[in-house]
């Protein structure tokens, strides 16, 4: 592996780790970092390049699974109650997570080919960034005017399903899965931290499943000499995502979504200018 290849793998892994769980759209940032700047597709065939993006996403998924390991073990019945609300009888269940996953899973299955073929343009992603920013600003405005649930253990099935409906917006590239679901959670009555917790926990099965399916699809395009390149990207994505998720969860109730919305609008405008 050349120095440039190592640099490319590291940068793309860092970008993935920074943006996968922050509500800023990892797709938009990967377009800037890869399609416009580094062009990893020139280092390998398109299928292998897609496989690399799946692998670094798996690094991010592993990071969030580690952050929520106690919660996951509790969901699986392998750990006793770990929070005060759980001791009072409130608890997030696998069924609630499933309810939240169904809408986007169904729409994604039905329209995957259409989305891949027609919606993955720079301009479409830019508009998604701006539209997602508007939703986030609306969520923060609503949050100031209503009481909210301060823990994910108190989420209802209705709220879980509504968050799942908002997640469908993330099928629009650039909208951001975490942006749409955190904003949706806030709109239906969760505080920012509870909405983020539900978003990240819900992300683990849906992202892991989608990533593994894509990896199987592109498996034949891989070769052993790509392993160092993939490993560098995976490690960078994992380490950075681990830090970002912990930092984000500590701050989100304080900073809300406005700073991310402003950043998204600026990035969307930059992307529109780049393709004019």
UniProtKB/Swiss-Prot annotation:
Subcellular localization(s) per the UniProt record: Cell membrane
Enzyme class: hydrolase
EC numbers: 3.6.1.27
One GO term describing the cellular component: plasma membrane
Keyword Endoplasmic reticulum: no
InterPro entries: UppP (IPR003824)
Gene Ontology terms, MF aspect: undecaprenyl-diphosphatase activity
Segments passing through the bilayer: 48-68, 92-112, 119-139, 155-175, 196-216, 229-249, 255-275
Keywords, sorted A to Z: Antibiotic resistance, Cell membrane, Cell shape, Cell wall biogenesis/degradation, Hydrolase, Membrane, Peptidoglycan synthesis, Transmembrane, Transmembrane helix
Keyword Cell wall biogenesis/degradation: yes
Domain of life the protein comes from: Bacteria
Pfam families, sorted: BacA (PF02673)
Catalytic activity: di-trans,octa-cis-undecaprenyl diphosphate + H2O = di-trans,octa-cis-undecaprenyl phosphate + phosphate + H(+)
Bilayer topology term: Multi-pass membrane protein
Biological process, per Gene Ontology: cell wall organization; peptidoglycan biosynthetic process; regulation of cell shape; response to antibiotic
Family statement drawn from the similarity comment of this UniProt entry: Belongs to the UppP family.
PANTHER family given in the database record: UNDECAPRENYL-DIPHOSPHATASE
Protein purpose: Catalyzes the dephosphorylation of undecaprenyl diphosphate (UPP). Confers resistance to bacitracin.
Further comment found in the protein's record: Bacitracin is thought to be involved in the inhibition of peptidoglycan synthesis by sequestering undecaprenyl diphosphate, thereby reducing the pool of lipid carrier available.
Name of the protein this chain belongs to: Undecaprenyl-diphosphatase
Gene source species: Bacillus velezensis (strain DSM 23117 / BGSC 10A6 / LMG 26770 / FZB42) (Bacillus amyloliquefaciens subsp. plantarum)
Lineage: Bacteria, Bacillati, Bacillota, Bacilli, Bacillales
Gene that this polypeptide is encoded by: uppP
């Amino acid at each position: 592996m050349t120095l440039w290849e190592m640099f490319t793998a590291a940068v793309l892994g860092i970008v993935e780790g920074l943006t996968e769980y922050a509500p800023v759209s990892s797709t938009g940032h990967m377009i800037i970092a890869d399609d416009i700047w580094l062009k990893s597709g020139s280092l390998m065939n398109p299928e292998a390049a897609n496989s690399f993006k799946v692998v670094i996403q798996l690094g991010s998924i592993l990071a969030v699974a580690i952050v929520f390991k106690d919660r996951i073990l509790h969901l699986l019945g392998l750990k006793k109650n770990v929070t005060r609300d759980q001791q009072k009888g409130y608890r997030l269940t696998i069924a609630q997570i499933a309810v939240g996953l169904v809408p986007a899973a169904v729409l994604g299955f039905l329209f995957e080919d259409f989305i891949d073929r027609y919606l993955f343009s720079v301009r479409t992603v830019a508009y998604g960034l701006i539209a997602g920013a508007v939703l986030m600003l609306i969520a923060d405005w609503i949050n100031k005017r209503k009481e909210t649930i301060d823990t994910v253990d108190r989420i209802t099935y209705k709220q879980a399903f509504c968050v799942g409906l908002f997640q469908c917006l993330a099928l629009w590239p650039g909208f951001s899965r975490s942006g749409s679901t955190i904003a949706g959670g806030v709109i239906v009555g969760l505080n920012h931290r509870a909405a983020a917790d539900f978003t990240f926990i819900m992300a683990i099965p849906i992202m892991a499943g989608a990533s593994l399916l894509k990896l199987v699809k592109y498996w034949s395009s891989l070769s052993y000499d790509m392993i160092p390149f993939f490993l560098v990207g995976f490690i960078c994505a994992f380490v950075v995502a681990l830090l970002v998720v912990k930092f984000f969860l500590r701050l989100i109730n304080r900073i809300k979504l406005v700073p991310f919305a402003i950043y998204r609008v600026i990035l969307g405008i930059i992307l529109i200018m780049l393709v004019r």
